[in-house]
């Protein structure tokens, strides 16, 4: 009976701290550092991913807590004189988890009723439904080795701040967008890694460029955001901006430097990345590379940032000065709609932007920006 009470008490204390960490950033930081030292083989990033899982999956966490309470009673903990007090604290935590789950559902219902028809996504995206499964979410607790011992991938990590957890889950139910990110961590080095935020294009597939850049020493973050034209540009910009907030808050867990964040946008993602610069803290992004950018209708550039920018287009001819043929004329029109102060367009003839040669060009540009060897 005494042993069962001790175990139950330890469980209640630990689970209460975990629940509290979903709302208090300082508590989570303390637990991440503590558990990474106590649990053998667990890194700070693994522990941080675990807390993200508990925060997002409140109903599953509540179920585990409920089962643990039943096990404690079966072991005889209820016969202890301290059981009532411990049980009361346990029920406070259980109630908090159920309340968070209820808020998520109610908020989603309210959000869905207010949502304009134009924002409603197509129903039945089975790939996204699979990503929301419990087993899929558990997979982010472990490191997936992509390329031997060079690049480590941390999948399905939440990038929304803790104070938006309820809104996160509510919008996930309505928008069918998971608001998660994949992170690629390079081999450990003496200094913290620079961060590249890869804002993907319409096809939403991850390029070979991503692990390649990571193998060169960059910490690459790929947000799963609401992409235009299926979603409004404002939603995409909001999600990418929140991703930057996540990096600033969590970079320490991945040996990355939150003061050295770069944007790499492809296709429509380049437009989203550029537009995001107007909505994030000034100078939080140190440079931006636009890969084959695609113009978004009715998007008016008002960005006045002086950060280094590079635009990479397909073709070896400057379409602005040589617009005799139809193809060059179309490119010239694109450039006209894609004028960004500080951007330097570069025309590189290639069959596909997703190649190692293109990645080498991109990496070289980022290294030049970091070393201040070239004014862009």
UniProtKB/Swiss-Prot annotation:
The chain crosses the membrane at residues 1-21, 34-54, 86-106. GO terms for molecular function: hydrolase activity. It comes from the Eukaryota. It holds the Pfam family Abhydrolase_3. GO terms for biological process: meiotic cell cycle. SUPFAM superfamilies: alpha/beta-Hydrolases. Keywords: Endoplasmic reticulum, Hydrolase, Meiosis, Membrane, Transmembrane, Transmembrane helix. Has a role in meiotic chromosome segregation. This is Uncharacterized protein C8F11.08c. Coiled coil: none annotated. One of its GO terms (cellular component) is endoplasmic reticulum membrane. It comes from Schizosaccharomyces pombe (strain 972 / ATCC 24843) (Fission yeast). It is a multi-pass membrane protein. It is found in: Endoplasmic reticulum membrane.
